[in-house]
Amino acid sequence: FLNALKNFAKTAGKRLKSLLN
């Protein structure tokens, strides 16, 4: 479960960076 949460955070972070750029 924790691993999935980390993976989700990584994906969200990448999408946020893409939107900001």
Curated annotation (Swiss-Prot):
Subcellular location: Secreted
One GO term (biological process): defense response to bacterium
Main location: secreted
Keyword tags: Amphibian defense peptide, Antibiotic, Antimicrobial, Secreted
GO cellular component term, pick one: extracellular region
Tissues where the protein occurs: Expressed by the skin glands.
General function of this protein: Has antibacterial activity against E.coli HP101BA (MIC=6.4 uM), K.pneumoniae PTCC1388 (MIC=7.3 uM), M.luteus PTCC1625 (MIC=4.7 uM) and S.aureus PTCC1431 (MIC=5.3 uM). Has no or very limited (<3%) hemolytic activity at concentrations of 15 ug/ml and 60 ug/ml, respectively.
Family, as annotated: Belongs to the frog skin active peptide (FSAP) family. Brevinin subfamily.
UniProt protein name: Cyanophlyctin
Species this protein is from: Euphlyctis cyanophlyctis
Lineage, highest ranks first: Eukaryota, Metazoa, Chordata, Craniata, Vertebrata
